Amino acid sequence: MRQVAIYGKGGIGKSTTTQNLTSGLHAMGKTIMVVGCDPKADSTRLLLGGLAQKSVLDTLREEGEDVELDSILKEGYGGIRCVESGGPEPGVGCAGRGIITSINMLEQLGAYTDDLDYVFYDVLGDVVCGGFAMPIREGKAQEIYIVASGEMMALYAANNISKGIQKYAKSGGVRLGGIICNSRKVANEYELLDAFAKELGSQLIHFVPRSPMVTKAEINKQTVIEFDPTCEQAEEYRELARKVDANELFVIPKPMTQERLEEILMEYGLMDL
């Protein structure tokens, strides 16, 4: 079983990328569980046909400790198992704790079955606080992919996430598997992301082009592969799935200093000299 965490700044398209990637892996015959670790609880919406899944934390709040697995785990597209850890009530408590509670509960209830090929954790990545780092800190996820684009804030976040990975890689076995570019059609985007990934000692594992097909599929509450398996964008996600499945380059990243990051941004025209 490969346990994979997908990180990236809010709004970058982590959840969309994760759900489309897992659909691609399902097309390869893989058995998958997706654990949403974002308080927004939208990590499994497309796999479940738009159903807002009841989160682990909401279920615990309403039903107490005596929870059955089928009340928090739902099967979605292609039998992909879906869980949302959810978040605390606004203004109360720590969302990161919710992730810890959820993963512990899934373990107790026997969700990590032997037939699983992959478990994906879709994690909010703007804040690399202790709770959100939990899937890597506790050694749950062994490999991490960071979703980024050619925008400055996406790269700042990716660099910060790399610092978190570096910190926990020494104690646990977690490694960076690569950067996934979710294109924003920025000038020199491919070249910038490729240089950024290499600077970290990693790779740009796939460049996902921007496509109106993604929005169309989302409006229909489906992944692109379910909505139109023959379109070019579906093939992009299948290619991403193949690359992740075949990936063997797992590194402890070498995060950049602020100065070095800004140099790279200047080099590719994102920052003015």
UniProtKB/Swiss-Prot annotation:
The modification ADP-ribosylarginine is found at R97. Binds 1 [4Fe-4S] cluster per dimer. The keyword Metal-binding applies. Gene3D superfamilies: P-loop containing nucleotide triphosphate hydrolases (3.40.50.300). ATP binds at G8, K9, G10, G11, I12, G13, K14, S15. It catalyses: N2 + 8 reduced [2Fe-2S]-[ferredoxin] + 16 ATP + 16 H2O = H2 + 8 oxidized [2Fe-2S]-[ferredoxin] + 2 NH4(+) + 16 ADP + 16 phosphate + 6 H(+). Its cofactor is [4Fe-4S] cluster. This is Nitrogenase iron protein 5. It comes from Clostridium pasteurianum. The gene is nifH5.
